[in-house]
Amino acid sequence: MNTRTMLLSLALTLMALPLASAASPGTFEGSGDTMSALQRGTYMSFVGIGLAFVATAFFLFMERNDVHRDLRPALGVGVMIVGIAGFQYNLMAESYLFDGSIPTDFRYADWFSTVPLMALCFPLVAGRKAYTSKRLFDLPGMSVPGLIMIGAFFMIASGYLGQVELDAAIKAGTDPASIHWYWFAQGMLGYLGVIVIAGTPFTGAYGLDDTKVTDPSLRTALSRMRKLILVGWLIYPVGYVLGAMGSGVEEMVLAYNLADLVNKVGFVIIVWHGVRNAESSRALAHDMEAGFHTLAHAEDKQDDAPSDDLLAIAAMSRGETVEEPEDDL
């Protein structure tokens, strides 16, 4: 067992002890009412998913120094995503345990922080060279990172306004005012904005040019990230509609919790896998290029420059496009 594994195991053990003791009550602390099986499962989903977030954050933090410095910001943002979510889920668990109410404020505090960071991962993984020259109204800050974060903020802010209306109606036992559907639709427009800027697996992106991403591992990661937000983010409106149609607090909360687990942990693992494979490709390309230079030097000690063929092979190993030489004939 290496040092990293030992530290991670120790940290998770120390965190699991208070979580286990906190999970023991079968009643709500505020009212003393006994939890139903569904309520118990809802509470345990907060505890278990929160622990999964914290464990993922530790794992990514330990992996951060093993990737190229150009790709570390993407992994660092991944640590922030699951780290913030783990902290907020602890607060949500405590809030739900008190009286079984919907922890909307804590949840949206999480989303206001983590969803724009998830959107920011797209330009970080693609790299600055992949940014397009498109801007919005030629205003400062309206480059690709700015646009994609504004779209995410717009989506979450609209969703919060709708959720507040919905929560008030659920608490009062009345039908929600129709205005909440307006906020819901506006939030979906923000979601579509993020999709347009970041791209989909089937269409190009407004703000990113994948042809300028030379590493195939990073292109694959971008495609998988797009698939995840295209499908995974749709779980959130499903949870919202469940609450609006009167299915119950727990059903809505469980849908949100499942969506967070799939989208946050799955998303950062895709980012980690892509940047680690890219680092392996860079290391292999470096070793191959060094070997080619050594071979060329051994073949012709009088000419230190390697042949064009060897340089072309080295460039191809890095994922770069090599132009065919023109025929002299």
Listing of model-derived features with the role each one plays in the protein:
Residues 1-23:
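N-terminal secretory/membrane targeting signals
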Residues 24-53:
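Hydrophobic transmembrane alpha-helical segments in integral membrane proteins
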Residues 44-47, 167-201:
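Extracellular-loop-to-transmembrane junctions of the mid-late helices
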Residues 54-60, 121, 157-158, 190-216, ...:
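Alpha-helical transmembrane segments in multipass membrane proteins, preferentially the mid-helix core
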Residues 57-63, 89-99, 108-148, 153-167:
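Internal transmembrane alpha-helix with an interfacial aromatic "cap," most often the third helix
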Residues 76-95:
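A generic, lipid-embedded transmembrane alpha helix
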Residues 176-187, 202-231:
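Membrane-helix boundary/juxtamembrane motif in polytopic membrane proteins
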Residues 196-204, 223-321:
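C-terminal transmembrane-bundle signature of multipass membrane proteins
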